[in-house]
Swiss-Prot record:
PROSITE patterns documented for this protein: PUR_PYR_PR_TRANSFER
Class in the EC hierarchy, top level: transferase
Organism phylogeny: Eukaryota, Metazoa, Chordata, Craniata, Vertebrata
Cofactor: Mg(2+)
Protein name: Hypoxanthine-guanine phosphoribosyltransferase
BP terms from Gene Ontology: GMP catabolic process; guanine salvage; hypoxanthine metabolic process; hypoxanthine salvage; IMP metabolic process; IMP salvage; positive regulation of dopamine metabolic process; purine nucleotide biosynthetic process
Catalytic site: D138 (proton acceptor)
Organism per entry: Gallus gallus
Function in brief: Converts guanine to guanosine monophosphate, and hypoxanthine to inosine monophosphate. Transfers the 5-phosphoribosyl group from 5-phosphoribosylpyrophosphate onto the purine. Plays a central role in the generation of purine nucleotides through the purine salvage pathway.
Top-level taxon: Eukaryota
Amino acid sequence: MATHSPCIVIGDDEQGYDLDLFCIPKHYADDLEKVYIPHGLIMDRTERLAREIMKGMGGHHIVALCVLKGGYKFFADLLDYIKALNRNSDKSIPMTVDFIRLKSYCNDQSTGDIKVIGGDDLSTLTGKNVLIVEDIIDTGKTMKTLLSLLKQYNPKMVKVASLLVKRTPRSVGYRPDFVGFEVPDKFVVGYALDYNEYFRDLNHICVISETGKQKYKA
């Protein structure tokens, strides 16, 4: 049975933090309920994930595959930490990067209809050790679809790192290999997670308000 690394579990009763305690862009002042995961905590957790990935995949040339658009901030910061470990450790990982773009959301619901709307030729992943970097696992359908797609190209190994995993009754039971935080079934934005393309410019992970949902509804 596959083993998965531990993560920080945020309980259903977590209240988050008052917006006034952090620097929030004024144009989002009425669109958020609270700060859920402060930026500093995201960075500290990402640093530790980099170490776990090095331990689990070290010694192999890795193709790091970023799932756009939401994964780009986590991807960039995670790779920065891996590069720092490469510079300062006896065990280093040769790494190249690639990108794929998927779409499965309209407003705050995962549609279940997964579209690959970007990315290079996936045949380049044949025989490679692949690290998929994702922002959030919601139902798990998107990732299971992507993994099935990649399997057609016969990669040597595939591991998945996701910053967030959502606890939801809609889950198909999929669990990534590396997880930053497990969060309740709330729609979160910020740190490149979007709501119809908005809120990507927010440093912290926050819970969107009903006002925000209505304002930016597709």
